[in-house]
Amino acid sequence: MKQAIVARADIGMGEGKLAAQVAHASLSAYEDAGPKPRKAWKGAGQKKVVLKATSESELFELADVAEREGLPHAVVRDAGHTQLDPGTVTALAVGPAEDELVDRVTGDLPLF
């Protein structure tokens, strides 16, 4: 079981902003999962990987694949209180789900 969080590298988020957006995505996708995968993921140590995307369109393409695969996922839009304009798409989380299923969506992306 794992979760992959894909964050945009093209919008110049500072380290703190990046950390916050990754956390938002992780929690939102966790909440999208059913009780069985949530329990399994928590019991297995909540494995996560943070990956890099280069555009908003790339995040939406990945989200579409996750949707078609029936995987829990969440797209995060920033509230715009600090560094980014309101509504800026910043991150996508896929999973928790079996590693192989998450990799079908995010397996070709580089580490952040």
From Swiss-Prot:
Q: Does the keyword Zinc-finger apply?
A: no
**One GO process term, biological-process aspect:** translation
Protein name, as recorded: Peptidyl-tRNA hydrolase
Recite the lineage of the species: Archaea, Methanobacteriati, Methanobacteriota, Stenosarchaea group, Halobacteria
For the keyword DNA-binding, the answer is no
Q: Which SUPFAM superfamilies match?
A: Peptidyl-tRNA hydrolase II
Q: How is this protein annotated for GO cellular component? A: cytosol
Subcellular location field: Cytoplasm
Mind telling me which InterPro entries this protein's record contains? Pep_tRNA_hydro_II_dom_sf, Pept_tRNA_hydro_arch, PTH2
- The protein's superkingdom reads Archaea
Family, per entry:
Belongs to the PTH2 family.
User: What is the documented function of this protein?
Assistant: The natural substrate for this enzyme may be peptidyl-tRNAs which drop off the ribosome during protein synthesis.
EC nos: 3.1.1.29
Signal sequence, start to end: none
| Major location category of this protein | cytoplasm
Q: Mind telling me which Pfam families this protein's record contains? A: PTH2
